[in-house]
Amino acid sequence: METDTGALPKKQDFSEWYNEILWRAEIMDVRYPVKGLYVWFPYGFAIRKFVYQHLRELLDRDHKETLFPLLIPEQEFMKEAEHIKGFEDEVYWVTHGGTTPLEVKLALRPTSETAIYPMFALWVRSHADLPIKIYQIVNTFRYETKQTRPLIRLREITSFMESHTVHATWDEAEIQVESEIALTREFYRNLCIPIIISKRPDWDKFPGADYTIAVDAIMPNGKTLQIGTVHHLGNHFSRTFNIQYEDKNGEQKEAYQTCYGISERCIAALISLHGDDKGLILPPTVATFQVVIVPITIGKRHEDVLAAAGKLKNDLENAGLRVTLDTRDLRPGAKYYWWEIRGVPLRLELGPRDLDSGKAMAVTRTGEKTTICLANAAEDTTSILTGITDAIRAKAGEHTKSHLCTTHTMDGLDIALNEGKVAVVHWCRDRTCGDTIEEKANSSLLGTEVRSEYIEATDGPCIICGKPGKATLVGRTY
């Protein structure tokens, strides 16, 4: 791959660009011989590490990390009928131990409610045990029958963060839902990914939930990608799995629950929204390397330049930055290309003239040039990286704003969707009208109670029947 210096497909051909960038930037290898299972390259896995490190830091404020088994006994998995109805066609079953048939089939977790909640029933006895707030980051398996796509639609989700909480009352669980939404906002702000939050219609909520709040991002082709969900589970699962507590008056009460999930789709959105025709563009907070130093070595001062580059690397690393020094025997231009496609936010070029001037050329991933003072390298570099983050966030915000619109007619909705936009319409919340919107516009009714800084959510007449309606998000989805 080191000698592969051909141009990427243009990003306007998003599907081709996406598939190529995963390979060329060393994110994922798609050649594993099982459909829907992919291999992380070390470079891509480092990006994943920094993304999930930030997510862990947010969750650790009031959750405890744990780990539950991958295998779920059939009798536990089948307890919650409504929940199972949503997953039964996607389950992988383990039926043998070696050559011996198992007495009880074991499901590979598609999600972990039915693994975790029998244990909650053992852990919860008194109101003093509540609330419980745990999370795990694990792999999950779903027999995906649609076309698979790396990081977006998988048979093995390698990086599924699922949070599960238990509360004394429905209202306390609702407060937890809002807390998870706030956490999600902070997480995606760190990734410079604008999000749209909405309440999924009842027919599209998580199986067994009272309601589902979903988080969507608008991809470069105008399709929406669901990159997070928060579910208020009410007491459905606690009733099924007998999760009860004794209140202060000595009475037995059913608990109320929430669950919350983010998968590696967050990295798909990160790659897709920020990248350009040259490759990845990574926010400094999650870049494998935040800075690459390219020494320009000429003639007799070769050793002087390398020594100065090494000192610069040490100075920046001592300031907490992730830095790589590229001393390979390649032309500078080949090195520039190598690191551009991999999205390193800042390149520092250091040659003989720079040693004389006490400065180094600084080039951002998007091509802006300035200089840093070698005597003040850490402070100057950190300032540039802050500016890079702000610029990436602003550009992504403009993309989202330009791909959102409000329309009041079905013709207007068709035009918006065909232009690669996501539309806000008014809908009365009647299922028949919802089905009509989806069928006529060949789209998905994403949700009501729209929360976005990029568009105003108002009330108005339903786009189908004219009855009073609420702002509703409509788009084409992955």
UniProtKB/Swiss-Prot annotation:
GO MF annotation, one: ATP binding
EC numbers on record: 6.1.1.15
One Pfam assignment: tRNA-synt_2b
SUPFAM superfamilies: C-terminal domain of ProRS, Class II aaRS ABD-related, Class II aaRS and biotin synthetases
Domain of life where this protein originates: Archaea
Intracellular or extracellular location(s): Cytoplasm
Keyword Protein transport set for record: no
Keywords: Aminoacyl-tRNA synthetase, ATP-binding, Cytoplasm, Ligase, Nucleotide-binding, Protein biosynthesis
Reaction catalyzed: tRNA(Pro) + L-proline + ATP = L-prolyl-tRNA(Pro) + AMP + diphosphate
Keyword Protein transport: no
Gene Ontology cellular component annotations, sorted alphabetically: aminoacyl-tRNA synthetase multienzyme complex; cytoplasm
GO process annotations (BP): prolyl-tRNA aminoacylation
Top enzyme category: ligase
Function: Catalyzes the attachment of proline to tRNA(Pro) in a two-step reaction: proline is first activated by ATP to form Pro-AMP and then transferred to the acceptor end of tRNA(Pro).
Domain notes per entry: Consists of three domains: the N-terminal catalytic domain, the anticodon-binding domain and the C-terminal extension.
Subunit: Homodimer.
Family, similarity comment: Belongs to the class-II aminoacyl-tRNA synthetase family. ProS type 3 subfamily.
Protein name (record): Proline--tRNA ligase
Organism the protein comes from: Methanoregula boonei (strain DSM 21154 / JCM 14090 / 6A8)
